[in-house]
A protein has these predicted regions:
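Ligand-binding cleft/hinge of the Venus flytrap
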Residues: 62-64, 78-87, 166-185, 213-217
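Short loop->beta-strand "edge-of-pocket" segments that line small-molecule binding or catalytic clefts
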Residues: 51-54, 150-166
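A ligand-binding cleft/hinge motif common to bilobed small-molecule-binding domains
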Residues: 98, 115-123, 169-172, 200-217
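Extracytoplasmic small-molecule ligand-binding "clamshell" domains
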Residues: 34-114
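Bacterial lipoprotein signal-peptidase II cleavage site
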Residues: 21-31
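Flexible hinge/capping segments at coil-to-helix
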Residues: 30-36, 40-42, 140-157
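Alpha-to-beta junction loops
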Residues: 87-88, 105-113, 157, 195-208
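Acidic, polar ligand-binding/catalytic clefts
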Residues: 83, 88-152
């Protein structure tokens, strides 16, 4: 499988998304009760619990292990903050499209799921300082060759997950209503479709794509 960054790489930064507060930078974030994958750090003396929503389909940031528990870089980072700050963490795995609505409704306190900081999101939620810089990259199906942005534009079908930064990148390349963009509900579905040749390529976060390629060579 071949991974290629296009010429005008879109840089995004992962951060925590927090419910917007008056007078601070704003943003929207969602999360609800865990359907699977709920877990928590050991309880501190204070007993304060921070409800953290994740879409555990973004290895190495967050994914589900064999026991359906959430694991990954974001989990380790949040647990380290909880230990230092003296609070407990309740992780909740939810579909991506439910994360920001749940945050806005107060069902969770934080969304931590490799969230890209955008101007639109800052209008409805607050963000932490960025803790990881991510590029959007093109994952190319077997037998396809992509050397530059013009090669990407020449592809017949390019996958992206609805609402992800890769979707926004695809819209910049092809147009928001272009039939070239094949949208998927989840990242695993898109990655599998690229692998099977159902689409010519897919656009997603560099760290996630690199992890997928490493484990599927």
């Amino acid at each position: 499988m071949f991974v290629n960054k296009w010429l005008s790489t879109i840089v995004s930064c992962a951060a925590l998304a927090l419910t917007a507060c008056g007078g601070q930078s704003s943003g929207t974030a969602p999360a609800a009760n865990a359907e699977v994958g709920g877990s928590s750090a050991s309880a501190p003396a204070s007993g304060k619990v921070l409800r953290v929503a994740m879409n555990a389909e973004f290895a190495p940031f967050e994914s589900l292990d064999a026991q359906q528990k959430i694991e990954g870089f974001d989990v380790d980072l949040m647990n380290a903050m909880a230990k230092a700050g003296g609070f407990q963490v309740e992780f909740q795995h939810k579909p991506w499209d439910s994360l920001f609505p749940a945050l806005a409704q107060g069902d969770v306190d934080v969304v931590m799921s490799a969230v890209t900081i955008t101007d639109d999101r800052k209008e409805t939620m607050d963000f932490s300082e960025p803790y990881y810089q991510i590029n959007q990259v093109v994952l190319v199906a077997p037998g396809k060759k992509v050397a530059n942005i013009n090669d990407v534009r020449a592809l017949s079908k390019v996958g992206a997950v609805t609402g992800h930064t890769g979707d926004f990148a695809a819209q910049k390349i092809f147009g928001a209503t272009s039939e070239t963009i094949a949208r998927f509900k989840t990242l695993p579905l898109m990655l599998k479709e690229v692998e099977n040749g159902g689409v010519d390529a897919g656009i997603s976060d560099s760290a996630v794509v690199a992890n997928y390629v490493k484990n599927n060579e």
